[in-house]
Amino acid sequence: MADTLAIVVAAGRSSRMGEGPKKQYRLLAGRPVLGRTLEVFEHAPAVDGVVLVVAPGEEDWCREEIVTRFGFTKVVAVVPGGEVRRDSVWAGLQALPPCALVLVHDGVRPFVTARQIAAVAEAARECGAATLAVPPKDTVKLGGPPGAPVSTLPRENLWLVQTPQAFRFDVLIKAHHLARERGLAATDDTSLAEAAGYDVRMVPGAYTNIKITTPEDLAFAEALLGGGPVLVGFGYDVHRLVDDRKLILGGVEVPHDRGLLGHSDADVLVHAVMDALLGAAGAGDIGRWFPDDDPTYRGISSMDLLVRVAAFLRERGLETSNLDAVVVAEAPRLSPFISRMRDNLASVLGVSPAAVNVKATTTEGLGFTGSGAGIAAYAVAALRRIVLPGDRVL
């Protein structure tokens, strides 16, 4: 039985966002908001799996364009939601495998951190129900229509509730059963737990854990992600063409009478890309990371090495903003394979293929590439720092 599973709810109609795509599918620094939210859960050690709840009819699109495209392996199911939030969470509960704890999270809160997820889960393990929350900074007044008398609420007793909210599985099931029997509606799941007689523990959240609901929220989120300079790196690599070797470029086996000589699979394109990424991060080069005299890397797929570089970038709070690469080869003709190379690179780096460009050219018979002695590759990578509130200062 899994220990902790999450229900990520993204079935809203997005009426307050205005015209255009729904809020969960709007691009935030080049990636869908929902994709950024799922990214946090994908790399949160406290979470074993995720059930994604979307609007009816959007399941296949989300599986293909978000879950599969960005490689979210923890998503165990994508299910249709209901008319109101309570029904959507209930749909997610029905799709959950057996587990001890359940987290419920808004799909449009991409700035929650792995540390906060772990804290709220541990609190629910101890007391049954917990939520992230922050005290209000502003004075809060209670009143009716404009012009009606108002009263000021004591701020020290108030909390602004966020997600994720965490529950022991039996607690959340009972709360939803009672809510359905009584016809209770609520804007969050802790309200249902309270109505069922359970106490809910407040766990300190962060003011940056915003729910993106309006265009103003989206602009604020862009500012959170976009702070700091763009980091640029350049990569170059070359390998000799020899007999009795496969030709691997961008993780694609390209039919040819010769292949590239190297300690690994000699994927010259991926090597140039890794050098560009490491250069942008100020982290040396592939010779330092993967020495050619280390037997560990003999014959290894360069795509596997790129996976390690991508993981390092995430640990450093960096993500790829844009990648442009060119392969220089007189032969073979590479255009039929370019799109697969691009998709392979984008998948490992966790970005949209639109952020990756791969092209091929020749040197018109000049030099070692023109004579067919070898193949070269150049790459330029741009990285951005991701702000991770509460986990680290970047």
Curated annotation (Swiss-Prot):
- The UniProt annotation puts the region (2-C-methyl-D-erythritol 4-phosphate cytidylyltransferase) at 1-230
Which cofactor(s) does the record list?
a divalent metal cation
Q: Which UniProt keywords are present, listed alphabetically?
A: Isoprene biosynthesis, Lyase, Metal-binding, Multifunctional enzyme, Nucleotidyltransferase, Transferase
Catalytic activity, as annotated: 2-C-methyl-D-erythritol 4-phosphate + CTP + H(+) = 4-CDP-2-C-methyl-D-erythritol + diphosphate; 4-CDP-2-C-methyl-D-erythritol 2-phosphate = 2-C-methyl-D-erythritol 2,4-cyclic diphosphate + CMP
Note down the stretches annotated as region 2-C-methyl-D-erythritol 2,4-cyclodiphosphate synthase. 231-394
Q: Answer yes or no on keyword Calcium.
A: no
- Can you tell me which residues bind 4-CDP-2-C-methyl-D-erythritol 2-phosphate? 237-239, 263-264, 285-287, 290-294, 361-364, 368
Q: Could you cite one Gene Ontology molecular function of this protein? A: 2-C-methyl-D-erythritol 4-phosphate cytidylyltransferase activity
Task: List, alphabetically, the CDD domains matched.
Answer: CDP-ME_synthetase, MECDP_synthase
What PROSITE patterns does the annotation carry? Answer: ISPD (PS01295), ISPF (PS01350)
| Gene Ontology terms describing biological process | isopentenyl diphosphate biosynthetic process, methylerythritol 4-phosphate pathway; terpenoid biosynthetic process
Disulfide feature: none
Q: Where is this site: Transition state stabilizer?
A: R16, K23, H263, T362
> Which residue positions hold the site described Positions MEP for the nucleophilic attack?
R155, K211
Statement: the UniProt record of this protein carries the keyword tRNA processing: no
Tell me which EC number(s) this protein carries: 2.7.7.60, 4.6.1.12
Which positions does UniProt annotate for a divalent metal cation binding?
D237, H239, H271
Pathway in which the depicted protein is active: Isoprenoid biosynthesis; isopentenyl diphosphate biosynthesis via DXP pathway; isopentenyl diphosphate from 1-deoxy-D-xylulose 5-phosphate: step 2/6; Isoprenoid biosynthesis; isopentenyl diphosphate biosynthesis via DXP pathway; isopentenyl diphosphate from 1-deoxy-D-xylulose 5-phosphate: step 4/6
Matching Gene3D superfamilies, A to Z? 2-C-methyl-D-erythritol 2,4-cyclodiphosphate synthase, Spore Coat Polysaccharide Biosynthesis Protein SpsA, Chain A
What family does the Swiss-Prot or TrEMBL record give for this protein? Answer: In the N-terminal section; belongs to the IspD/TarI cytidylyltransferase family. IspD subfamily. In the C-terminal section; belongs to the IspF family.
Record HAMAP family: IspD (MF_00108), IspDF (MF_01520), IspF (MF_00107)
Tell me, in a sentence or two, what this protein's role is.
Bifunctional enzyme that catalyzes the formation of 4-diphosphocytidyl-2-C-methyl-D-erythritol from CTP and 2-C-methyl-D-erythritol 4-phosphate (MEP) (IspD), and catalyzes the conversion of 4-diphosphocytidyl-2-C-methyl-D-erythritol 2-phosphate (CDP-ME2P) to 2-C-methyl-D-erythritol 2,4-cyclodiphosphate (ME-CPP) with a corresponding release of cytidine 5-monophosphate (CMP) (IspF).
Q: What is this protein called?
A: Bifunctional enzyme IspD/IspF
Native organism: Desulforudis audaxviator (strain MP104C)
